[in-house]
């Protein structure tokens, strides 16, 4: 069901796929909803589909926030949602009614999430710049992703090991702050969650722009390092430094990426 819902979102409701004979065909996503809901296991949906458009980091992140909204499995509309359209069903997932056992569907976004992320490997950038992990903590539906360059050499305080744990609260921990927000939303979901989502979208869209700006600054520093190395005949050793934790050739690039990653992660506490 979760795969069907993700496909449904990314294809705008139309599954385009190879029929196994080399032919690309398109079918309404709802042609397979009975399979997704477990009513017709013989009506197998395709293993993969072609998205309606190029998939962005934001697209993937938003899929991970899904609770089947707008589908027959929409968890905000059945009796289990209560009076505040809560799209969560607490464990255990099954229940009995009139002698029959029923099971609540598992959504993509879920309350027991510790952390979540979207990895972005950008081959059109040098290795020292191209890797990004958009990282978040607690429930994906009520937390935002912050960009962390993979060459960052310092851990933000909010993600630091030892800054709180599962049983020890810390008001400087990303997990605990997001956990507070999430639990507040669970009490009045239809009132609070839309406001939180608005703030999430604003932050993530802003960072998409800032990442591009930061990339350009990092590229300038990278080119300066490469030009300087070439003049000194040290291009090979510089190439090694790209992936070395101790390499100094790209120290300016790494410092820039680290500062941006750490400062951005800490913005939630401002």
Positions of predicted regions on the chain:
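C-terminus-biased signal that marks the final domain/tail of proteins
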Residues: 1-270
């Amino acid at each position: 069901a979760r795969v069907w819902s993700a496909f449904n979102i990314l294809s705008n409701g139309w599954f385009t796929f190879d029929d196994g004979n080399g032919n690309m065909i398109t079918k309404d996503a709802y042609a397979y909803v009975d399979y997704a809901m477990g009513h017709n296991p013989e009506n197998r949906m395709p293993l993969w589909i072609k998205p309606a458009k190029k998939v962005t980091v934001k697209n993937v992140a938003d899929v991970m926030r899904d609770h089947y909204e707008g589908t027959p499995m929409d968890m905000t509309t059945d009796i289990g949602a209560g009076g505040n359209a809560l799209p969560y069903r607490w464990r255990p997932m099954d229940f009995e009614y009139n002698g029959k056992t029923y099971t609540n569907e598992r959504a993509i976004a879920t309350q027991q999430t510790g952390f979540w992320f979207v990895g972005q490997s950008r081959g059109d950038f040098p290795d020292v710049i191209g890797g990004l992990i958009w990282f978040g903590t607690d429930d994906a539906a009520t937390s935002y992703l912050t960009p962390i360059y993979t060459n960052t050499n310092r851990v933000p305080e909010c993600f630091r090991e030892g800054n709180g744990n599962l049983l020890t609260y810390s008001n400087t921990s990303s997990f605990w702050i997001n956990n507070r927000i999430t639990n507040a939303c669970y009490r009045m979901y239809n009132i609070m969650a839309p406001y939180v989502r608005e703030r999430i979208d604003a932050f993530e869209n802003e960072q998409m722009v800032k990442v591009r700006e930061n990339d350009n600054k990092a590229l300038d520093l990278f080119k300066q390092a490469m030009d300087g190395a070439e003049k000194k005949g040290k291009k090979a050793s510089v190439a090694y430094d790209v992936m070395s934790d101790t390499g100094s050739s790209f120290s300016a690039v790494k410092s820039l990426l680290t500062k941006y990653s750490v400062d951005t992660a800490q913005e939630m506490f401002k």
